[in-house]
From Swiss-Prot:
This is Capsule polysaccharide export inner-membrane protein CtrB. GO terms for biological process: polysaccharide transport. The gene is ctrB. Belongs to the BexC/CtrB/KpsE family. GO terms for molecular function: carbohydrate:proton symporter activity; protein tyrosine kinase activity. It comes from Neisseria meningitidis serogroup B (strain ATCC BAA-335 / MC58). It comes from the Bacteria. The chain crosses the membrane at residues 32-52, 358-378. GO terms for cellular component: Gram-negative-bacterium-type cell wall; plasma membrane. The keyword Transmembrane helix applies. It is found in: Cell inner membrane.
Length: 387
């Protein structure tokens, strides 16, 4: 028995050598799983865990409104309406689009080194032109638009402005500058609308004033040419003079009749008769001046004078109406003025809102597993089809 032991041990050792070694679980993973799940997840873990730069978002909110008639709203919108203002939704969209426009960016770059904010900070994947391939202005504008977001709440009428950059203070500065630009745009819209509203009324006033000047000059020229300054007053004066002459004529006739009756040969009779003839002549002249057929008679001048006078009066009334319309236009323009009210000032964030590191890593893992599952099913289906 002692001689057989070495043989048995040798046989057992040889059998153990023939057994295959167990593969580790890592080696059991298919290349497809490595490509779709492990490698992307590791890259995501390394990037978001160690290299991805923090990005800070400064937030502010504002509303554009005008003192128009109120409408029924709920919540904060009703509170804003209670102050006597109505929302100007069309204009708030205009302000929002302007804040993200090239014109706004050009104005912003005059006071802040915006491109430097986004080109010299942050990791290569996050900052603008991180690999030096696209440095055009159009490329920077498209990048910048993704850093400025505006959300509009149709219920309350409030817009929220979010500006993201790699530095909290820089985000706040850009946000503040954009709010000032929005306010400047509103003032520009107000000035233009007011000018358009008032311009027509001012032109009407100018035209009416020219008509008054022309009509007044025509009336003055007519008065000077015809010696008539107030036809009605002059007619009243002449009629009063005729009345006095007629009264005096009656007195003279009475005296003359009395003298003739008492003393027919009285020497006063010729004088009274001469005075009677003189009065009759004067009365006839005055009556002809008032209603005679001559061109200079008041009756003939009345129609022309009345026309010129009425033209002057009408022109003055039109001027007064135009002035009233101008004042009404100014009041209406003031009533339609727009106002940009800042609800909350730009914040100075002390916590980075982006990137969402854990979320991105987990999302990469889940997406990789989904892709792996789909590709595995496709591969198995193809193999089964071939078999």
């Amino acid at each position: 028995m002692s001689e057989q032991l070495p043989v048995a041990v040798a046989t057992e050792t040889k059998a153990e050598r023939k057994k295959p070694k167990k593969k580790s679980w890592i080696k059991k993973l298919s290349p497809l799983f490595w490509v779709t799940v492990i490698i992307p997840t590791v890259i995501s873990l390394v990037y978001f865990g160690f290299f991805a730069s923090d990005r800070f978002t400064s937030q502010s909110s504002f509303v554009v409104r005008s003192p128009k008639s109120q409408s029924s709203l709920n919540g904060l919108g009703a509170i804003l309406q209670g102050t006597g203002f109505a929302r100007a939704q069309d204009d708030i969209y205009t302000v929002g689009e302007y804040m993200r426009s090239r014109s706004s960016l050009d104005e912003l770059r005059k006071i802040l080194p915006v491109r430097e904010f986004y080109e010299t900070k942050g990791d290569a994947f996050s900052r603008f032109n991180g690999f030096g391939f696209r440095g055009e202005e159009e490329a920077f504008y498209q990048y910048y638009k993704n850093q400025v977001m505006i959300n509009f709440d149709t219920v309350s009428g409030i817009s929220t402005l979010n500006v993201t950059s790699f530095d909290a203070l820089e985000s706040k500065k850009i946000n503040e500058a954009l709010l000032k630009q929005g306010e400047a745009l509103i003032n520009q819209l107000n000035d233009r609308a007011r000018a358009d509203t008032v311009r027509y009324a001012e032109e009407v006033v100018k035209t009416a004033a020219e008509r008054v000047k022309e009509a007044s000059q025509n009336l003055t020229d007519y008065r000077i040419a015809n010696g008539v300054f107030d036809l009605k007053a002059q007619s009243e004066v002449q009629m009063g003079l005729v009345s006095k002459l007629q009264d005096e004529l009656i007195v003279i006739q009475t005296q003359l009749d009395q003298v003739k009756a008492v003393t027919p040969e009285n020497p006063q009779i010729p004088g009274l008769q001469a005075r009677e003839q003189s009065l009759r002549k004067e009365i006839d002249q005055q009556l002809r001046a008032i209603s005679g057929g001559g061109h200079s008679s008041l009756s003939n001048q009345a129609a022309e004078y009345q026309r010129v006078y009425l033209e002057n009066q009408l022109a003055e009334q039109q001027l007064a109406a135009a002035m009233t319309s101008l004042e009404s236009a100014k009041v209406e323009a003031d009533r339609q003025q727009l106002y940009l009210e800042v609800i909350s000032q730009p914040s100075l964030p002390d916590l980075a809102h982006e990137p969402k590191r854990l979320y991105n890593i987990v999302a990469t893992l889940i997406i990789g597993l989904m892709v792996y599952g789909i590709l595995s099913l496709l591969t198995a289906s193809i193999r089964e089809h071939k078999n």
